[in-house]
Every structure is written in C-alpha cells, then in structure tokens.
C-alpha cells in the first residue's frame, strides 16, 4: 500500500521462472528412484503436495545507473533471504553500453549469478574498434570470469 501511495518503493523481480513438479512416473521413467517409502519430502515430487519451485529470477534493466544496479541486488537478496530450498538462478539482463557500469554489477558480491547483455558481441567489437584499453580489459575480465555473457546464452544457462 505504501508503495502505491508513493511513500515507499517496491522492489520486485521483472521475470520469475518456476519449475513445475514431477509425477513419480516421470521420475521413475528409466528406473525406480522414488516410491511411497522414500523421498517423502522431496520438493520436486508432485505427490508430496508442494508448489512449483522458483527456478530463476530475471531483473531487466535497460541501463545500469547505480540505483538500478542496487535494485537488482536488493531483488536478489530478498529472494535469497526468503527462499526455502535451493537458491534460484538470479540474473540481470541489460543493454548497458558502458563496461565500467556493467562491471559494477557483474563483479559484485556474488548475489547475482551473471549479467546478460543483449548485444555483447557487438559491444566487444565496438569497444575494440574505439581502442579503449581499460574498457577492453574490463569486458575481457568479465567474460573470462563468466560474470558477463550474451543474451543468447541465457536459455541454455537456465535449462540446468
């Protein structure tokens, strides 16, 4: 209510991805893994009466001013603190063209899994063409450290 009236600020993920629960027949398709005597509390079993599992949280930020970067971190920390079970994938998608701003989020404290850029390969090419050594080094560090990836990698990374 306070957020709606303008006296507070609501921070929530832009996209959430849930993983549906599995029937025992799906889990036991190749061999017997679960039955009525074992895995009685496993969250992934539909027969245990749970709800879909939070698989991923995606924060979409067109650009990365410092307050937007902080919002992404706040979203992540809220999920981490309030989760039950495994930690979901927590990612940020952005179009930010400034490597130092990308680094401010991607090199953070580990609350964000990875930052995905909507045109990373083009950004790297342009930064190299401009010849900014620091910017090239920053991007290379982020990419080699698997802290920054192209948006095309996101679906496969979330499939795990």
Predicted regions located by residue number:
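Short, well-ordered amphipathic alpha-helices
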Residues: 15-20, 73-80
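Active-site-adjacent loop/helix micro-motif of nuclease/hydrolase catalytic cores
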Residues: 25-30, 63-75, 86, 100-103
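C-terminal tail/extension regions appended to the core domain(s) of diverse proteins
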Residues: 82-160
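Short, flexible loop/turn elements at secondary-structure junctions
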Residues: 19-21, 61-64
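Conserved catalytic cores of phosphodiester-cleaving nucleases, focusing on short active-site segments
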Residues: 15, 56-60, 72
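A short, structural micro-pattern
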Residues: 9-10, 52, 109
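Elongated scaffolding segments in large macromolecular assemblies
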Residues: 49-52, 71, 80, 87, ...
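Active-site metal-binding core of divalent-cation-utilizing nuclease and nuclease-like domains
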Residues: 1-48
């Amino acid at each position: 209510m306070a957020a709606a009236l303008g006296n507070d600020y609501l921070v929530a993920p832009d996209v959430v991805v849930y993983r549906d629960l599995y029937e025992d027949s799906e889990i036991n398709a190749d061999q017997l893994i679960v039955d009525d005597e074992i895995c009685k509390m496993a969250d992934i079993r539909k027969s245990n009466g749970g709800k879909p599992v939070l698989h991923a949280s995606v924060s979409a930020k067109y650009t990365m001013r410092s307050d937007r970067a902080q919002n992404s971190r706040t979203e992540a920390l809220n999920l981490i603190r309030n989760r039950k079970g495994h930690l979901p994938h927590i990612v940020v998608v952005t179009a930010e063209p400034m490597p130092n701003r990308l680094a401010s989020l991607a090199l953070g404290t580990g609350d964000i899994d990875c930052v995905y850029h909507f045109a990373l390969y083009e950004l790297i090419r342009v930064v190299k063409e401009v010849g900014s050594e620091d910017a090239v080094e920053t991007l290379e560090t982020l990419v080699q450290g698997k802290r920054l990836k192209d948006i095309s990698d996101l679906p496969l990374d979330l499939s795990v």
